[in-house]
Design a protein with these regions (language model features):
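Membrane-penetrating hydrophobic segments
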Residues: 2-18
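Short, glycine/acidic-rich hinge or "gate" loops at secondary-structure transitions
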Residues: 217-227, 549-569
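Surface-exposed binding/hinge segments that line
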Residues: 171, 175-180, 194, 199-203, ...
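Gly/Pro-rich hinge or "lid" segments in bacterial periplasmic/extracellular proteins
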Residues: 297-423, 427
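N-terminal lobe/hinge region of extracytoplasmic solute-binding protein
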Residues: 47-166, 370
Length: 914
């Protein structure tokens, strides 16, 4: 049983580089030669180094949720209320001066009007998206500091006006009416008789909410039919229609003070405004003193988000009314048997909201999916190995439809059989790029020889600059956990855990057998030998040099866990970002065998935190010498003392090496990154000869071990990927709370009342006290008492928040003293009645806590966590670019306006064939 708060990260073989970086590339100049066929055809082509893998609901966005993914296509084949649109491509010169940024605006997409009801009862209607005001340059030389800036409007009825933005601060109800006479398109590009209507948003909400099996069964589905649908309609390894698939984002609406239960009640969700159907979002607490959250809701939930991508209610209703007209296809676009159609297809035989919304059949295949976006999806072309997305002639924006300078087709090509060697793939791609056979190429994958070729003729190759701004992606993807998952019963521990007993005892205070038996506690990891061990190891490394090896000097280390360009978010309500405090939040401290802060002295100056600036001054003649931090010599001695103490306290393990093997979490490990990891492993053995660390790349013969590392925590490391719910450190901390079991850690800190730890980590101690105070004011109904959350068995602790185990019954094991999840006779977890939604509880806590803290205290907390939560070198966000403006390659005929935090804006791309 797996329940995640949301799908945060999706890893493809390769995503369009300009889209990933989320900023407009800028053409320096243009030459004129024979137009490539793709340019003449207004086609954008991208190629993957992997075969196409069909899956169910591949082209249907109506049962999905969360932030847009670069590797997805839904954002340009489907539509929702609103979108962001770029008005122009930026202009950045060779000196990296931004002469003109991309200006962008909010755009009424399917919405005709936005109606706001304010706290004083006033109703305001905004019926256009004019954005005629473009902000002036903010630098003294007449240039801009950012390459993407929002345009505004003086039109008081525009959603881009200052009046609208200010009104959101006092809004208690937001409604959308829908544009008239927008028709859906099928996979052949044909106009259907089905219109986009307000009710479509009700259907898409139900389709998304009913992803969760218990919700589905309560609304007409059954476990038996779920199993049938999973086996007959879905690809073999699919989680769809199982209890491992769930919708985990509803808590977010509660964080934004919305009554999400109303979304499931058609009479409350689809109301009337001036006689028209209006989709209605109502505040839960309308008290005049309650801070409105509609700005956050507007920014997070209505843009770059899949939650409200429509499903055609008219089409679904028609098929339910006339099932004889319906042809039912599996994920392979193959028609299913009449028996399966009877059991899972449309009709009036079944009742419930799941059947009403076509839960088992709508969108399973491309052929049963309808599109209201600027492009529509054709079925996969197995002859040419590509997916094609064609311009939708039925799209509501007729001016865009009739224009001849935008994209008519987006084509994604796939490998015929299996991946080829990565270096060979990029070598081929560069040739294709030069010939115009693919539209973009990641500059970071160029060899030095290829870069030299590019720089000789920048205009020909479409050389331009992009700006990398990261406001929303937390810099943690895989992290070491304080409590380790248990293996399946009867497992040979030598073939499961990727570390030995000495390592386990040092870091976790338990042997592998004790971990497997569910006896591990938090003590050693939080404030014992585990804290000393990992902080010494982290602080001993010169992460500046590690980044130099990994990225050839293009990046600087980022060991802080928060998004570097995200707002701090404190009570000052200013625009300070985490990156404004770069040296502080990326400084590392360490603690000796007794838990005391380690101090250093250099040139008469005493210090206890090693900053990147200090490490930049480290010199050496070999890579291993350069890998030493500014405190290396002291830390080496302190580690020797720690190990000596360990040997005395653990005589059966005395003299043993501390071994661990970690796998690189992704299948493609480039040579530079591998060299950096190999150098780090050798470095650790020189820090102390008993440290035997190994970083292993993925290979097919090790796939089982790699999967167990990645998904089952065999190295004590688990997936923690997280995208912000809104622009504030509060959301980044929220992700850590579930991702690295920070809630359990805070309870442990509060309960232990350890004077040494509390002195070393005063902000963590303050935080622990605060969350208990908050819980007193907002009591939780939990299967484990709040004050005992640090006593959950390590078998279930990671899943308590991450997978929603708090919805099930726990029982205290009298032998171990740990709380364990209870199961019925069939092996199913037993539900816990009226459980508090901890996702909501934690998110609300962080929102309130951070908004009341000063930025200075938030930075102190961030810095403490940089040290406390160890550095994970296989995390590819361990570094950030030295310069925000970096080179990129996009075919010189293409102009791409893009927006920070957005995916590749195919609709907004234009082609200049001159």
């Amino acid at each position: 049983m797996e329940k995640t708060k949301r799908t945060k990260v999706l890893f493809g073989t390769l995503a369009p580089i300009v889209g990933i970086l989320g900023v407009a590339p800028v053409l320096l100049s243009a030459g004129c030669k024979r137009l490539p066929d793709n340019v003449k055809s207004n086609r954008f082509v991208y190629e993957y180094n992997s075969p196409y893998t069909p899956k169910e609901f591949d082209e249907d966005a109506s049962r999905s949720y969360g932030s847009f993914l670069e590797t997805s296509t839904w954002q340009f084949t489907h539509s929702t209320f609103l979108s962001k649109t770029g008005l122009n491509a930026a202009n950045i010169n060779a000196k990296k001066q931004i002469l003109e940024p991309t200006f962008w605006k909010y755009r009424l997409e399917l919405a005709k009007e936005v109606i706001l009801t304010l706290k004083n009862g006033t109703t305001k209607v905004y019926d256009n998206d004019n954005a005629e005001v473009r902000p002036a340059a903010d630098k003294s030389d007449g240039t801009y500091s950012k390459s993407s800036i929002k345009a505004t409007s003086k039109d008081s009825k525009s959603i881009n006006s200052e009046a609208f933005w200010n009104d959101l601060l006092n809004t208690v109800k937001m409604q959308f009416t829908i544009k008239d006479n927008i028709y859906y398109t099928n996979h052949k590009g044909e106009k259907t008789p089905y219109k986009v209507v307000a009710r479509d948003f009700y259907y898409t909400w139900l389709r998304t909410k009913l992803i969760t099996q218990k919700e589905r069964i309560a609304n007409g589905g059954t476990k038996e039919l779920d199993e049938l649908a999973n086996k007959q309609l879905c690809e073999p390894s699919s989680k769809t229609f199982t209890d491992n698939d769930s919708y985990g984002n509803e808590y977010l609406y509660k964080v934004f003070n919305l009554n999400s239960s109303d979304f499931s009640d058609e009479s409350k969700f689809i109301t009337k405004y001036n006689g028209e159907d209006a989709v209605t979002f109502d505040a839960k607490d309308k008290n005049a003193n309650t801070k409105s959250q509609f700005r956050n809701f507007w920014d997070k939930c209505l843009f770059s988000n899949y939650d409200w991508m429509t499903a055609s209610s008219q089409y679904i209703d028609d098929m339910n009314e006339h099932p004889e007209k319906f042809k039912f296809y599996s994920y392979l676009n193959e028609e299913v048997s009449s028996d399966l159609k009877t059991k899972l297809g449309p009709g009036k035989t079944h009742t419930g909201k799941f059947w009403q919304t076509g839960g088992y059949w709508y969108g399973v295949s491309t052929m049963t999916t309808l599109f209201a976006g600027p492009y529509y999806a054709e079925t996969y072309d197995a002859t040419n190995y590509w997916r094609s997305y064609k311009k939708n002639s039925n799209y509501w924006d007729t001016e865009w439809v009739n224009a001849d300078n935008n994209l008519k087709e987006i084509r994604m090509k796939y490998a015929k059989s299996s991946e080829i060697d990565k270096e060979q793939f990029y070598k081929n791609q560069f040739t294709f790029y030069k010939n115009g056979d693919v539209t973009s190429f990641p500059y970071s994958q160029l060899s030095d020889i290829q870069k030299a070729e590019i720089l000789k003729d920048k205009a020909r190759f479409g050389y331009r600059f992009i700006m990398d701004i990261n406001e929303a992606n937390a810099n943690y993807i895989f992290n070491t956990q304080p409590l380790v998952k248990t293996p399946p019963k009867g497992t040979d521990l030598n073939n499961w855990f990727l570390f030995n007993d000495a390592y386990a005892k040092m870091l976790y205070g338990s042997t592998r057998q004790e971990i497997a038996d569910g006896k591990q506690t938090l003590d050693a990891y939080v404030r014992g030998t585990g804290l000393s061990f990992r902080t010494i190891l982290d602080a001993a490394v010169n992460w500046n040099f590690f980044e130099y090896l990994r990225k050839n000097g293009a990046t600087k280390p980022w060991v802080a866990k928060l998004a570097e360009d995200g707002y701090v978010g404190g009570s000052e309500e200013n625009t300070q970002t985490i990156n404004d405090f770069y040296q502080r939040v990326n400084a590392l401290s360490a603690y000796d065998k007794d838990g005391n802060l380690i101090k250093y002295s250099k040139n008469g100056n005493d210090f206890s935190a090693i900053t990147p600036e200090m490490n930049a001054d480290v010199t050496g003649t070999t890579d291993l010498e350069k890998m030493r931090s500014a405190g290396f010599d002291v830390l080496k001695q302190k580690l020797t003392e720690l190990i000596a103490k360990f040997d005395t306290e653990n005589p059966s393990l005395a003299g043993q090496d501390f071994t661990i093997e970690t796998y690189f979490p992704w299948q493609n490990l480039d040579a530079k990154y591998k060299n950096a990891l190999d150098t780090l492993a050798t470095f650790y053995s020189q820090l102390n000869p008993r440290l035997k660390f190994k970083y292993t790349p993925y290979t097919q013969d090790k796939e089982t071990q790699w999967k167990n590392f990645r998904y089952n925590g065999t190295a004590g490391i688990d997936f923690t990927g997280w995208g912000y719910d809104y622009n504030s450190s509060a959301s980044g901390f929220d992700g850590l709370t579930s991702g690295v079991q920070l809630l359990q850690t805070l309870v442990s800190i509060k309960n232990a009342n350890n004077a040494t730890f509390d002195k070393n980590f005063p902000m963590l101690k303050k935080l622990a006290e605060a969350i208990f105070t908050y819980q007193t004011a907002h009591p939780v109904n939990s299967p484990v008492p709040f004050a005992d959350l640090d006593k959950i068995s390590n078998a279930d602790s990671y899943g308590f928040l991450r997978y929603g185990f708090y919805e099930y019954t726990f029982e205290k094991n009298t032998t171990t003293g740990r709380y364990e999840m209870k199961y019925d006779a069939d092996g199913n977890p037993i539900p816990f009645a009226n459980a508090t939604d901890f996702s909501e509880f934690i998110s609300l806590f962080w929102r309130d806590y951070i908004s009341k803290e000063k930025n200075e205290d938030i930075i102190k907390l961030t810095t403490e966590l940089s040290t406390y939560l160890n550095v994970d070198p296989y995390n590819n966000r361990i570094g950030v670019l030295n310069e925000k403006l970096t080179p990129s390659l996009l075919n010189k005929y293409y102009k791409m306006p893009t927006i920070f935090g957005s995916t590749t804006p195919y609709r907004d791309i234009t082609i200049d064939k001159k």
